Amino acid sequence: MLRTGWAGNMYVVSSVAHPASVRAAHPARVGSWLARWWPLVAVTALAAALRLSTLNLQSFWFDEAFTPLHVLHPSLWATLRTVSHTENTPPLWYVLAWADSRVLGTGEIALRLPSALAGIATVPVAWAIGHEFAGRRAALVCASLVAVNPLFVWFSQEARAYALFVLTAALAMLCLLRAEREPTRGRMAAFALTGSLALLTHYFAAFLIIPMVLWLACEPRVRRAALPAIGALVLVGAALLPLISAQQGGNGTQWIGKWPLWERLQAIPQYYLTGYSGGELGHRIELLVALPILAGLGLGLRRMLERPHPKARRGVLMAVAIAAGGILIPIVLVPLGADYLAPRNLVAAMVPVTAVIAVVVVWPGTGRTGIALAAAIALAFTAISIDVDLTPRLQRSNWRGLAKALRGGPRERVITTPELGSAPLRYYLPELGSHNLQAGSSVLVSEIDETGVRESAAELYEPFRASAGEPPAPGFHLLARMEVGALAVYRFVSPVPRMVSEATLRRHVITLAGPRSKVLVEAGSQESP
């Protein structure tokens, strides 16, 4: 539509968009946006469904229950002080958990929600990483695998720092890629910030940051611009050293060295293929999941040799370097006396692993075969993630269900449990006292409940004693034996309250945990030294 008229001594002819054409352009822009981004929206929605729909399906385990019982306090300062004495993790996640608990409380959904949101947010970050490497196809595959991988889903439903660790490390990797491509001051600052957040979330972030820093330092084109960012990361790492030293006084990592190294090394690929609890599925399922990955990598590597793609190849090398640092450095440190190699601590290194798989499997020239193999990997991951929700033996031990079975007992009662059952039982049974029965003391009780784990990960629980089910003290008889998933409880009762010593209770605890077992006392029980 034309508009004409005089402006001063000039006659002006101008073009004005017709309102109808403006209205027509708006749907076109929306349609263009949807066509471009609907795959990412769909994959992110799938990630949200897998994480949020069953957020409180599983019981808290020891570490999750320990946080609201002993770490979180009304005061943030008191919480941080407790972190320095009882935890083996930097403080960032606990600051978020403290803020979350002030608003939403300390229930399962409330404390797990930050992890779920972090897991969901990692999906678009994975998309961006894949896009930086090799375009939209690699972006879609990378985001899809992160969305449905059972290991990432598991830690997105755990009230611990791991999901936030994955997110911050993935953000640091993305910022590294963009800073390396265009080394502006702002992009280097973003890399320094996200890398610092990763270090403040989990100490194992250092093993991922080291190869990132070395990559920038060895690249003449960006070295000078990267120096301030590298310096900032070094300062943050140095600032954490006093906290690391203070936390070494605890015993939170002693269990790692008791887990045979070979079993831990085997668990690293198993965790990625079938999830944290996927060992229960057996090696056949691991092989079935690994087959499309290996086939896709083989096909993609062949096409890489036939059709070189310098940018994508450089991205693959960078991702391999980051993943290698995150996995191999902790392994190398084991024979040097620094054995902190728990497979769960390597979870963030699985993001660059996923990026490598995504880029190589759909490398240019792999065609429909590459797409089919990528879809097969995603479907296998999805099936296992759903299977965890449907199969109790793949879930965390059901201390919530066991506590429900124990409710309504007499006030004169003690409960014996493996060490890893003490915090969950106290969380779900608030009537239990806040302390264990001390060595050399006795307690007047009419019921003794002995709990244990029938079957679970060997590195976490001990087997039952052969004498399990026999009365632990004179005058008591077996009232009932109950099973809740992999957990079992023997309930022994006496017609009248009897004084029972701590030594007697510990001798007859149904697991072979010895000193690591706990004797929990009901708040109404009478103790004597």
Positions of predicted regions on the chain:
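Short, intrinsically disordered terminal tails adjacent to the first/last structured region
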Residues: 1-33, 377-378, 526-529
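Membrane-proximal helix-loop-helix interfaces that form the catalytic/acceptor-binding platform
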Residues: 12-15, 35-528
